[in-house]
């Protein structure tokens, strides 16, 4: 008998789903109570041009991650689709930082070695970068939350420049941050 495989995602895992017209992107990771890793390796599922695709270790070498301790990218947390180019997508990881994807291929992993994102866990040379929240503002800036550090809010401009905001005294290495919520509904601009 012939095997019939419907056009669907690779798996049923879903933490965050974002859409832009017909395109759908799904981060498949997650965390347990206390923001402890699930150690999910399911990658990223996306629906573009009427077809489901996946970015996993099997399809993309960079899904092995860059920190030498995990040897795989764990826990994809969130998705942000670039409003100026829906083929340009960012996916956060509770391990590796931020994956930048263009046309379904990873073009960069933003982490503690190439951006102001802050790594945690001295046992692992501070290479574990805990990122959840991602959101674009009306000017095309990508806002990113980085947990367990006072430098917990970062922005990546459309020109590729990173800026960081330090909340030392209000937020410290014990704080975990989730979603970025941007309110663009005012005459004075965006509020984070």
What are these regions (language model features)?
Residues 1-192:
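Carboxylate-rich, polar loop motifs that coordinate divalent cations or form catalytic acidic clusters
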């Amino acid at each position: 008998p012939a095997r019939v495989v419907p056009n669907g995602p690779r798996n049923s895992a879903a933490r965050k789903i974002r859409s832009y017209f017909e395109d759908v992107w799904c981060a498949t990771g997650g965390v347990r109570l206390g923001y402890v890793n699930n150690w999910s390796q399911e990658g990223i599922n996306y629906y573009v041009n009427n077809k489901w695709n996946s970015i996993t270790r099997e399809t993309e070498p960079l899904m092995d991650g860059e920190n030498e301790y995990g040897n795989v990218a764990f826990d994809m947390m969130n998705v942000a689709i670039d409003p100026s180019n829906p083929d340009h997508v960012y996916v956060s990881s509770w391990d590796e930082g931020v994956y930048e994807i263009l046309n379904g291929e990873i073009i960069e992993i933003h982490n503690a070695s190439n951006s102001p994102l802050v790594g945690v866990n001295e046992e692992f040379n501070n290479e574990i970068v805990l990122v959840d929240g991602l959101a674009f503002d009306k000017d095309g800036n990508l806002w990113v939350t980085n947990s367990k550090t006072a430098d917990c809010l970062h922005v990546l401009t459309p020109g590729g420049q990173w800026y960081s905001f330090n909340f030392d005294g209000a937020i410290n290495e014990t704080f975990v941050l989730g979603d970025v919520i941007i309110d663009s509904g005012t005459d004075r601009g965006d509020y984070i």
